[in-house]
Amino acid sequence: MHYFGVLAALSVFNIIACLTRGKPLENWKKLPVMEESDAFFHDPGEVEHDTHFDFKSFLENMKTDLLRSLNLSRVPSQVKTKEEPPQFMIDLYNRYTADKSSIPASNIVRSFSTEDVVSLISPEEHSFQKHILLFNISIPRYEEVTRAELRIFISCHKEVGSPSRLEGNMVIYDVLDGDHWENKESTKSLLVSHSIQDCGWEMFEVSSAVKRWVKADKMKTKNKLEVVIESKDLSGFPCGKLDITVTHDTKNLPLLIVFSNDRSNGTKETKVELREMIVHEQESVLNKLGKNDSSSEEEQREEKAIARPRQHSSRSKRSIGANHCRRTSLHVNFKEIGWDSWIIAPKDYEAFECKGGCFFPLTDNVTPTKHAIVQTLVHLQNPKKASKACCVPTKLDAISILYKDDAGVPTLIYNYEGMKVAECGCR
């Protein structure tokens, strides 16, 4: 992507981040740009000589905004981001993006791997396997856990002469107390008991355990699940040893998938702040109207000339139409801006942007507000009293995004709002 293509992409991220939080674009005032913004549309060689733009500082501001909107305090460490995300999370992301009718019950999905595993197996009890899985679960307070699933890969080591059919039973407990792994007297709560008849991935709902962990005191509660597998004998012959995969040299490790929703009132706050911003802008225009500033006769003639009907050639009409406010393409590639280490998917996407001017008379296709119409009329009469209405995003769409959080936990947000321009208008 060209240098200024990256700059345009980052500009969109800054606007999007501020719109989704309902905040003014304060960072723009902090950027060390010494010339008018129009300079960026000149020849690239001229820009380098005529402006003093700190691209590194600009990129850092943009990254800070995006991290904050994803509830990240910093970019995850390289050690954690280098770990391959579970295939389940990638498949889940691909399913949601490919099939728009596939809507999850919750907007946020996290995948937690085991922090530690202790296997308690007695050599005498060939058909009986027991594992204690320790997880480190961290869910923000403003999120509500709606569902939790334990995904386990069942393996079967068949013996010679054993029947082809498999049969066994798996029981999962929530370990309520007990700091020692070998504490057989620890209190347990039965979560699920399920018959096993095949190898491969199995899913078990453990919502009650995870909800308890989230609400409990982390200093007193251990996020532990006890998994017990028992193989059954069929016609006097053991089917083999049923077990779960827990060794770290495989991709089939146990996964705890936690579904949650953001229950904060961020949307309500955004609407209130946006309304306050609109009122502030209206007051600003009215204050300017109350002053006795007057523009030059030449400026007034130029603005009024736009409103007068005149005969245009077909080429001129096409040129004017192309300059009106509209949505245009803007392709964003996360690798080119150095964010691909923690954003897993998408690698790139079409963000779109708004380009063009808001000329009098404002037509319905740019959905002008009453304020924009009044502002345009005031500018037409006296450009010094009010600026033109701006071509800006009036509707933003969401995308699905898969990234790693501060702790390196793969996190999928199904509807990450405000990442793609849907409509443009004059405001």
Curated annotation (Swiss-Prot):
A Pfam family: TGFb_propeptide
Keyword annotations: Cleavage on pair of basic residues, Cytokine, Disulfide bond, Glycoprotein, Growth factor, Secreted, Signal
Compositional bias of kind Basic residues: 307-321
A Gene Ontology molecular function term of the record: growth factor activity
This protein's record includes keyword Signal: yes
Positions of region (Disordered): 288-321
Tissue specificity remark: Expressed selectively in the dorsal neural tube. Lower levels seen in kidney and myotomal cells.
Carbohydrate-modified residues: 71, 136, 265, 292
Quaternary structure and partners: Homodimer; disulfide-linked.
Protein family membership: Belongs to the TGF-beta family.
Name under which the protein is recorded: Dorsalin-1
Species this protein is from: Gallus gallus
Lineage: Eukaryota, Metazoa, Chordata, Craniata, Vertebrata
Gene name linked to the record: DSL1
